[in-house]
Amino acid sequence: MLTKSQKTKQRVLEAALSLLQNGEPGKVRMADIAKQAEITRQALYLHYPNRADLLIATTRYLDEVNGIDDLLRPSREAKTGIERLDHFIDVWGNYMPKVYGIVRALIRVYDTDQAAAAAWDDRKAAVRHGCAAITRALKQDGLLEPKQQDATDILTTLLSLQNWEQLTQECGWSQSKYLQYIKHISKLSLMSRSAD
């Protein structure tokens, strides 16, 4: 059972998420979120002292609502680096359509809105963390070709929202085609030829 404080935080996060999904992140103010959550601005600031903290919490809440930890469990529990890579690409590739609207909005104001930039940077760091775990697993399996840092950079770039957007939204690829080719390209880029 949630405490009163937890219920208020949840209401705030739901309000922030709704406003971000239905508006422009750069124009969503703390006062707007407080009003939507039916609390005072002062009460909002007790929970989130600044807009950046609130936007970061909101994007993490979006992950929680979508059950990202449960979705990633097969990747995290995979026995091999290749299994981990395949599971992670499946999860992230299929997750992007769910968060596309809000992430695209954050990216659009990235250069002019520090709070939105902080929220997007936080999510990119989470993806990079997953990519680093994959490259570590591939290295432990003796399959990693480039240096681990370079491999993490490559995989993070391959799995970027911008690449997904280009292929699925601009080029019209289906999700299954995107997943198939990103897995193939990732393996070609990361794994030694002897692993083929």
Residue ranges and their predicted role:
Residues 1-7:
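N-terminal intrinsically disordered/low-complexity leader segments
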Residues 11, 19-53, 57:
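Helix-turn-helix
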Residues 48, 108-112, 158:
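Short helix-capping/turn signature of helix-turn-helix
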Residues 53, 57, 70-98, 152:
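Hydrophobic alpha-helical connector segments
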Residues 59, 66, 70-76, 96-117, ...:
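Amphipathic alpha-helical segments used for helix-helix packing
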Residues 93-107, 114-141, 149-153, 186-191:
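Amphipathic alpha-helical packing segments from all-alpha helical-bundle domains
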Residues 138-185, 193-196:
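Hydrophobic/aromatic-rich alpha-helical bundle segments in the mid-to-C-terminal region
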